């Protein structure tokens, strides 16, 4: 059990080196109405081998492999407060977060708007 978890985490960290997909135009935080804004270490397409592996390990089947997924994400409650900054990619996801390991249906957020 621990080996499976450690393998999953190790593969998720390798995803940082994976090429990023063509990013859609970021939206302002006020347009995120599907759940809390997430801060993800990596945002990639579901067709990415690492994302596909994580989805498979979690038993998640997606119809559209071009959908953006966030890997190793954590929620940002209120932007601008100390401790709520995001040094990676802030995204708005479709409230499909699996324990922070992967979030599905993500759109980049421009927190500077």
Curated annotation (Swiss-Prot):
Disulfide bonds join 32-92, 39-86, 40-73, 93-106. It is found in: Secreted; Secreted, Cell wall. This is Class I hydrophobin 1. Residues 1-17 form the signal peptide. Belongs to the fungal hydrophobin family. Pfam families: Hydrophobin. It comes from Coprinopsis cinerea. GO terms for cellular component: extracellular region; fungal-type cell wall.
């Amino acid at each position: 059990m621990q080996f499976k978890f450690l393998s999953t985490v190790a593969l998720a960290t390798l995803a940082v080196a994976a090429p990023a997909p063509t990013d859609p135009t970021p939206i302002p935080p006020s347009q995120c109405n599907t759940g809390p804004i997430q801060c993800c270490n990596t945002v990639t397409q579901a067709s990415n081998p690492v994302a596909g592996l994580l989805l498979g390990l979690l038993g998640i089947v997606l119809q559209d492999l071009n959908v953006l997924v966030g890997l190793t994400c954590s929620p940002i409650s209120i932007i601008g407060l100390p401790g709520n900054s995001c040094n990676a990619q802030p995204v708005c996801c479709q409230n499909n977060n699996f324990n922070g390991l992967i979030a599905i249906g993500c759109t980049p957020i421009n927190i500077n708007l």
